[in-house]
Amino acid sequence: MSGKPAARQGDMTQYGGPIVQGSAGVRIGAPTGVACSVCPGGMTSGNPVNPLLGAKVLPGETDLALPGPLPFILSRTYSSYRTKTPAPVGVFGPGWKAPSDIRLQIRDDALILNDNGGRSIHFEPLLPGEAVYSRSESMWLVRGGKAAQPDGHTLARLWGALPPDIRLSPHLYLATNSAQGPWWILGWSERVPGAEDVLPAPLPPYRELTGLADRFGRTLTYRREAAGDLTGEITGVTDGAGREFRLVLTTQAQRAEEARTSSLSSSDSSRPLSASAFPDTLPGTEYGPDRGIRLSAVWLMHDPAYPESLPAAPLVRYTYTEAGELLAVYDRSNTQVRAFTYDAQHPGRMVAHRYAGRPEMRYRYDDAGRVVEQLNPAGLSYRYQYEQDRITVTDSLNRREVLHTEGGAGLKRVVKKELADGSVTHSGYDAAGRLTAQTDAAGRRTEYGLNVVSGDITDITTPDGRETKFYYNDGNQLTAVVSPDGLESRREYDEPGRLVSETSRSGETVRYRYDDAHSELPATTTDATGSTRQMTWSRYGQLLAFTDCSGYQTRYEYDRFGQMTAVHHEEGISLYRHYDNRGRLTSVKDAQGRETQYEYNAAGDLTAVITPDGNRSETQYDAWGKAVSTTQGGLTRSMEYDAAGRVISLTNENG
């Protein structure tokens, strides 16, 4: 055996119960569900670097997120880590991943899931209807071709919420990291066949993300081009609330032509851009094959709640280098909010980045492509030294932290940490890389009991020997907690998995009622005294009205971006909120016209507050957004910081 985690349906656990999670035919020793690396964004240091990978990472920068069920959230994740089995480069360029950059490679001897964090997760091949669970990654992969999962299966309820055509298709694969969903649906895009294509065309040896589906039957759909240069690429999205988005994509050839045209028409055209400086095609990189297709802008095309009031500009916009690397990000006000720089010799390897109004962070790499130094011009810098099963992190104050690791690939974990003050902590893990014990610097040990398959915590034993136990239902939802003193708290759920009652350790129960079978939002809550509160929600999941137990109602209004614009209390008491085109709160006005105003700097720091009587308070910041002085009523208080960002001097208004 390889020692890697595996579970087969029907196997008996140490407690005598059969395993209903896992594949019906897991090969013992197969690398089922093991990732090529730890999560790039899992453990970070500084601004930020993953020291276990030696990778520069930027975990989850969100550019677009409107409220609603199954919302279209457009975010970017960067990692300089290169997997040996990469998917094609995504729409943000090498090193970057979007939420939709999920791809399943179908091989004779393996399934390789390329996730949107830049990893490759290896599974065994699945027969129609089979499901497999990765204990190390807490992820399910299921192949269609089965009407229902067995009774008691963790996914039985979520699987049954899928449309029959999805459940029964053996050509579709589905993935999820929660028994409450949503599902990531992995299919293929329809293509217009060419004149020389053999019909019917065979299915491709991969699957792409075609949509999401939740336990209430709501869906998010990606529309991919069927013909032309953009064949197979996502150009439209319909979210779970019915909004429609258009994704504007450009090819490398289009960007090259635009750059040459711009160069020729520029007033500074003494040295026109050459074809070699901005090639029409891009070579493959260590991050995968590259078609050169990039996302340049996202437009909101339809909004059911605001059909006549659509934005006149894109919600977000992107520009790229001549090598197809993400260069800059612009928000809906067309303000540049991010900038990136890359290594000219290694396309996609980020060497610097900057936020609007902030200094530039820089990075150096060794010959193996690992970050060895990050340079902060206005704060702490860090150096990284890599040895076998040991990483040393030293900051610019010469403080040293040593990480001792065990395991490989996706099971690599820090088991011992030597801190700068000389203290040492230890951590223990099971065969799936899940935390089972922690020992602090004083030698006090806390232990975690885990469900052998799901990884849910079943008990926690503290250093004094006191034990807390946790119980779950078939859907891995917490149903009871028994404290060391024997007192118990309980939770109950309805068939779709919504919380319907919650009983505290003291025996008091709060109950939740739902009016909409297709929503997880409660209509009423009733506490232990019988007092009931009522809630009304918008189609986007925003609270429209709240009625307390006395019958008093508060109403709320929002704009198309989900920002609260008004609050109406009883007896005509109202507050109105206004925002600038970047979404920052600029004023709050009451029903009598009294207004408080807010001002900001380029970085988004609040620099001034002007009260209704005209009094003005101001705050100034250093390069990293720490307040260095506040002035109110002509009096100033100032602060100074050391390189680690700690306050070393505070001067009050009296000097």
Where are these regions (language model features)?
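Extended charged/polar low-complexity repeat regions
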Residues: F92-P94, D109-G655
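Acidic, aromatic-enriched beta-alpha/helix-loop junctions
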Residues: Y81-D101, D108
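Segments forming oxygen-rich coordination pockets for charged ligands
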Residues: G46-N47, D101-L104
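A general structural signal for short secondary-structure junctions and capping/turn motifs
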Residues: K56, T62-P69, R103-L104, I112-N114, ...
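Intrinsically disordered, low-complexity segments enriched in small residues
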Residues: A30-T83
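Intrinsically disordered, low-complexity proline/glycine-rich segments
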Residues: M1-V49, Y306, A313-Y318, R338, ...
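Hydrophobic/aromatic beta-strand elements that line small-molecule binding cavities or substrate pockets
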Residues: A24, T62, W184
